[in-house]
């Protein structure tokens, strides 16, 4: 997406490496004991994994045949066809929500929230979702953003939890090393009090927080 707060801008340059489903599963089998003892499994992230729906569907389907728990980490910017092709083989979706208002989302990602919202509704009514929300002062941490986030979560009828991810500035040096201007250079990290208040507001609204938040 090229998010304004990305801490890995060094990964934006295009490159490629071909790997097969069999190769991925072979590597997973080597760690099966670890997955079984820890309750872990296969989580496919990116980039955006839904940009390769055919491969992703085959990979997840094969993993489930071998009794691995499956998950994808997506920003939700994908076609409905791609999503529906993959969902049957997913146990949980980690959904990265970059903002809860049209303005903040557009500023931070240069993409439209409306598309992401529709896809979140599509997914959230079919699969368990961990909604990962980045808390950025001045962009996603205000009262309007909080109210919109609560409204959005309440519109989902399925199993959903929210993980609040405090914005950090650890990626600034990477932007500078690449000769790029960091868009949020003057934005401070949220204080512990701001983080706690935001999480408590979600709890008071009846929203479940991810285990890491409790």
Residue ranges and their predicted role:
Residues 1-19:
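Canonical Radical SAM [4Fe-4S] cluster-binding loop centered on the CxxxCxxC motif
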Residues 6, 176-184:
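Short glycine/proline- and charge-enriched loop/turn segments
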Residues 16, 141, 190:
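Catalytic cores of large soluble enzymes that bind and process phosphate-bearing ligands
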Residues 25, 29-177:
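Conserved AdoMet/S-adenosylmethionine-binding subsite of the radical SAM
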Residues 106, 183-196:
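A short acidic, glycine-rich active-site loop
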Residues 193-214:
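A cross-taxonomic marker for long C-terminal extensions/tails that follow the last structured domain
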């Amino acid at each position: 997406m090229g998010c304004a707060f990305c801490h890995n801008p060094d990964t934006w340059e295009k490159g490629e490496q071909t790997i097969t489903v069999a190769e991925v599963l072979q590597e997973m089998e080597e760690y099966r004991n670890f997955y079984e003892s820890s309750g872990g499994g296969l989580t496919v992230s990116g980039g955006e994994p839904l940009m390769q729906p055919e491969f992703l569907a085959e990979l997840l389907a094969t993993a489930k045949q071998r009794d691995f728990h499956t998950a994808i980490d997506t920003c939700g910017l994908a076609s409905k066809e791609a999503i529906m092709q993959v969902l049957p083989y997913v146990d949980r979706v980690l959904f990265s929500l970059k903002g809860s208002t049209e303005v903040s989302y557009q500023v931070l990602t240069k993409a439209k929230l409306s598309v992401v919202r529709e896809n979140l509704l599509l997914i959230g009514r079919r699969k368990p979702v961990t909604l990962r929300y980045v808390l950025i002062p001045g962009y996603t941490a205000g009262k309007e953003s909080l109210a919109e986030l609560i409204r959005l979560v309440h519109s989902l009828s399925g199993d959903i939890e929210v993980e609040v991810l405090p914005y950090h500035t650890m990626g600034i040096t990477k932007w500078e090393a690449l000769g790029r201007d960091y868009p949020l250079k003057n934005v401070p990290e949220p204080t512990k009090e701001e983080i706690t208040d935001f999480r408590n507001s979600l709890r008071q609204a009846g929203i479940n927080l991810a285990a890491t938040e409790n």
